[in-house]
UniProtKB/Swiss-Prot annotation:
Its EC number is 2.5.1.75. ATP binds at G14, P15, T16, A17, S18, G19, K20, S21. This is tRNA dimethylallyltransferase. One of its GO terms (molecular function) is ATP binding. It comes from Geobacter metallireducens (strain ATCC 53774 / DSM 7210 / GS-15). Its cofactor is Mg(2+). Belongs to the IPP transferase family. Keywords: ATP-binding, Magnesium, Nucleotide-binding, Transferase, tRNA processing. Residues 39-42 are annotated as: Interaction with substrate tRNA. Pfam families: IPPT. NCBIfam families: miaA. SUPFAM superfamilies: P-loop containing nucleoside triphosphate hydrolases (SSF52540). HAMAP family: IPP_trans. It comes from the Bacteria.
Length: 309
């Protein structure tokens, strides 16, 4: 497909608490756009406060897509996201509107815009053995094992990212080839969209202060009650969705493992670390145009309008 024939996407990305949702909303109102979520946690129904979803008032201002689309018990994957997002984008374009993709899950954005890696299927027995090792010896042992056979993948993954560490080892044990080799061979060649990537840059101390304020606000708005309600409704702490930042710490607090103050301290600490990992991911993408928001909105709007014209 020729470049000029591709659907145009404005992508707003950056670390958590950087102001992505606010920028996406302001842009959508100014350019006749609709917002598509690219946050791996905001797809889940009933997980609202801890994922910092847009409010109902904000959603009434412009149409929002891919929020509250699956039950927390569903293991929603990057491939699932690509399928849902592709359909939403096609629908928005068909109605003559502009698409604004917003979120901090870099993998989702990359797979949507650059294609899926053709890697082998899974093996339940191998996965269970790896999960048993993680449970018995700790994730650090799995990460060291991965580093020995696929140092490229190990360097990309946080030592606590159990799901992806297990997957990378599973691929190696099934095929004898590192997962990074499959990714290198693929090189994410299929690019169906023409993209303008905007990244919000925030000075570190300001970002960390926003993180602290956001966590305090989540607790004040009822995060503990939200988690308690999910647990009571039959969503156990062992679910993948319930293991995300904010939910896992409150689950542990409700189980009597530590105080609410300690849970809040851990949420803030883990969120800061997550924001740092997000920035590391996004900084590797040379196509991102880094912008200041809200201070330089007029300049951002000018860049976006130039992209369409």
């Amino acid at each position: 497909m020729k470049e000029e024939e591709k659907t145009r996407l404005v992508i707003v990305q950056g670390p958590t608490a950087s102001g992505k949702s606010a920028l996406a909303l302001e842009l959508a109102e100014r350019i006749g756009g609709e917002i598509v979520n690219a946050d791996s946690m905001q797809v889940y129904r009933g997980m609202d406060i801890g994922t910092a979803k847009p409010s109902q008032e904000e959603r009434r201002r412009v149409p929002h897509h891919l929020y509250d689309i699956v039950d927390p018990k569903v293991n929603f994957t990057a491939a699932d996201f690509r399928e849902h997002a592709s359909r939403a984008i096609a629908d928005i374009e068909r109605r003559g509107k502009r698409v604004i993709l917003v979120g901090g899950t870099g993998l989702y954005i990359r797979i949507l815009t650059q294609g899926l890696v053709a890697s082998p299927g899974g093996d339940d027995n191998i996965r269970r053995e790896l999960e048993d090792q993680a449970h018995g010896e700790g994730l650090e042992s799995l990460h060291r094992r991965l580093a020995a056979v696929d140092p490229v993948a190990a360097a990309r993954l946080h030592p606590n990212d159990g799901v992806r560490i297990v997957r990378a080892l599973e691929v190696f044990l099934l095929t004898g080839r590192p997962l990074s080799a499959f990714q290198e061979a693929h090189r994410f060649a299929d690019e169906p969209y023409r993209c303008l990537k905007l990244g919000i840059t925030v000075e570190r101390e300001l970002l960390y202060r926003r993180v602290e304020e956001r966590v305090d606000r989540m607790i004040a708005e009822g995060l503990v009650e939200e988690v308690r309600g999910l647990l009571s409704a039959g969503y156990p702490a062992t679910l993948k969705a319930m293991g995300s930042i904010g939910y896992r710490e409150i689950c542990a607090h409700l189980a009597g493992e530590f105080s609410l103050d300690e849970a809040m301290r851990l949420i803030k600490q883990n969120t800061r670390q997550y924001a740092k990992r997000q920035m590391t991911w996004f900084r590797r993408d040379s196509e991102i145009i880094w912008v200041e928001y809200p201070g330089k909105f007029d300049s951002i709007l000018s860049t976006v309008m130039g992209f369409y014209h």
